[in-house]
């Protein structure tokens, strides 16, 4: 019996078994891969009966391999030595399991059977449940494209001056992630992504949804001042002292309401691939969505903190 590695993951083995065992991707993904190879060859593959790769990892082992790779970022060769299989077997297992968490969607607090998979789902949920959104972008350093390749500068971030990939996170007022996506190259500004990916259009379709954003989405706050709140504008140098104090207090209050989405981003950064991604850039989006979906399962189980009302209530009705 092979030793099972200790898995520092957000999901327990019981949760993984109950959620994923009925969604094994073997048949669908394998059929799609064989179809693509058939089109590339132009004919059926001539193979003797019983020939082909011997897949020695059962579904539970493939799940463990994928979760260890997502959590710790271990090389596939090291995982192959641990499970006593070939490196290609580990790579195939990770490619099969990695799409499962994004396909399930993001967990919703206090709604066990509800899952959010698209931006439309997020805004519809926020409108129905009167949830104020927190929106923030983050970026992860990736490998630099090869010299001479077209579009090499598209990944260079103007903020970090490194090759990065950016994502956008949506959370509620308690820092529980509702959705994370809008994956784009590091050179694209947050405001450009807001317009090109349909976030601004979703606000127009759901006028009752409100959100807190940072300075990067200033344009969105200018377009929709009744729905989106951004930090106050910077004052002139000759502004009165009272206005400076008022701006500082307003900025502090807005930052206090928005900071919880930074905590949601910090949960992603605890996973090794989100600290610095060393794999293929083409696989980053799928890896990020898988990690974000797993983190949402844990954050959704956090108890909702109820805010005590300060409204005065009469102990007894007034006598007329």
Segment roles from a protein language model:
Residues 1-57, 219, 303-312, 318-320:
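Charged, often Cys/His-bearing segments associated with DNA-binding zinc-finger transcription factors
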Residues 57-73:
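Short, amphipathic alpha-helical "recognition" segments used to contact nucleic acids or chromatin
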Residues 22, 26-30, 71-75, 96-99, ...:
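Short helix-loop boundary/capping segments at the starts of domains
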Residues 78-102, 106, 110-320:
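Short, well-ordered secondary-structure "scaffold" segments embedded in the functional core
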Residues 36, 50-52, 61-64, 165, ...:
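Short, flexible segments with low predicted structural confidence
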Residues 52-60, 280-287:
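Structural motif
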